[in-house]
């Protein structure tokens, strides 16, 4: 049966709602669709805005590859199924089998910023399309964050991707612009706060949000800072918990809920329950007016307290907490990565990933990864 001759605009509108992984397969069915899916940046942005989103858990393998898992929270028995392995060939080596040693991954807009502690270079990678952009840095390090500036917030396709970062050796903020393919220094904008590793940072609507701390006469203050790639400025964001904390290294983590809200994992000390707080929907009209709601309170046994020091996901509607932790059993020589799912009843479901933990790497959860057709 021949395909109906639908108007081009209607076909584009329908395709923009098809999940990216299925759309990529459809591109081989006809040349117009192939051009639309692979060569049209405007459609890529429209598709990212419209397409259905999915939870994907990313974990580091021992060989520095990434495996991805789909998390299914429907039914009485939640699961985390392996969806496949991602490989990133390193063009620096002649042998195509050699791969870039990824230590940390930062996610924005369907793109992955992959960094290595031992390299003066990084790569931005779209795992779905295979597009990569390799970028030289001035020093080794992994405190880099991907985002975008946008002059007209109403035009989705007018996004300029950028990378912001700072080195441990100094207080300067560096910013890389994809359009100019160059780095520049932003002087005098870094707040007088201590910023921890990038797993305490997330991207939401193109901005980077990060937990920070400062030593005061009263002890240690906890702060949430946002970096706006359009204004190139940091700004404080209100927190729902007391600012005083024991340290920044405790059970304080950030995540993103369905690409619209921030989530905070907070535990004041080892004797306290862990609290999961979620903001209102953050968009261009929020203008710093952020409100928080506590959606979960977890009281787990002492041997499971390590769950509170990992990256996490939270399903606000189902009131479920998800994290990845590296465990070492008494009889084992190696650590293994495990996925944990905890409900509001504090019942813990443990899923063994079947993977040994990578030395020097934390098992990574991307807050909400959405496979996309986005171009850099």
UniProtKB/Swiss-Prot annotation:
InterPro entries in the cross-refs: F-box-assoc_dom_typ1, F-box-assoc_interact_dom, F-box-like_dom_sf, F-box_dom, Gal_Oxase/kelch_b-propeller, SCF_F-box_component
Pfam families reported for this sequence: F-box, FBA_1
Domain spans labelled F-box: 1-46
Protein name as annotated: Putative F-box protein At3g18330
């Amino acid at each position: 049966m021949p395909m109906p001759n639908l108007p081009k605009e209607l076909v584009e509108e329908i395709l923009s709602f098809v999940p990216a992984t299925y759309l990529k397969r459809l591109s081989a069915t006809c040349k117009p669709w192939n051009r639309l899916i692979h060569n049209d940046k405007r459609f890529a942005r429209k598709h990212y805005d419209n397409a259905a989103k999915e939870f994907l858990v990313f974990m580091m393998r021992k060989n520095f590859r990434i495996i991805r898992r789909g998390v299914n929270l429907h039914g009485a028995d939640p699961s985390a199924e392996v969806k496949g392995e991602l490989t990133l060939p390193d063009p620096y080596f002649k042998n195509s089998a050699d791969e870039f040693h990824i230590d940390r991954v930062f996610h924005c807009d369907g793109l992955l910023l992959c960094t290595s502690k031992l390299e003066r270079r990084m790569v931005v990678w779209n795992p779905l399309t295979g597009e990569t952009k390799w970028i030289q840095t001035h020093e080794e390090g992994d405190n880099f964050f991907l985002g975008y500036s946008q002059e007209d917030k109403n035009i989705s396709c007018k996004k300029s991707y950028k990378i912001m970062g700072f080195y441990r050796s100094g207080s300067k903020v560096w910013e890389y612009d994809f359009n100019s393919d160059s780095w520049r220094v932003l002087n005098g904008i870094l707040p007088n706060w201590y910023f921890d590793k990038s797993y305490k940072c997330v991207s939401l609507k193109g901005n980077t949000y990060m937990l920070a701390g400062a030593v005061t006469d009263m002890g240690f203050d906890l702060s949430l800072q946002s970096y706006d790639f359009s204004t190139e400025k940091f700004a404080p964001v209100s927190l729902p918990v007391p600012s005083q904390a024991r340290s920044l290294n405790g059970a304080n983590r950030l995540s993103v809920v369905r690409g619209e809200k921030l989530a905070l994992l907070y535990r004041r000390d080892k004797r306290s329950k862990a609290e999961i707080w979620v903001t209102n929907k953050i968009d261009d009209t929020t203008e710093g007016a952020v409100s928080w709601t506590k959606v979960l309170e977890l009281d787990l046994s002492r041997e499971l307290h390590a769950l509170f020091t990992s990256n996490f996901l939270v399903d606000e509607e189902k009131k479920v907490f998800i994290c990845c932790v590296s465990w070492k059993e008494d009889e084992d020589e190696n650590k293994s990565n495990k996925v944990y799912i905890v409900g509001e009843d504090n019942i813990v479901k443990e899923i063994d990933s079947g993977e040994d933990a990578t030395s020097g790497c934390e098992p990574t959860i991307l807050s909400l990864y959405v496979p996309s057709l986005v171009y850099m």
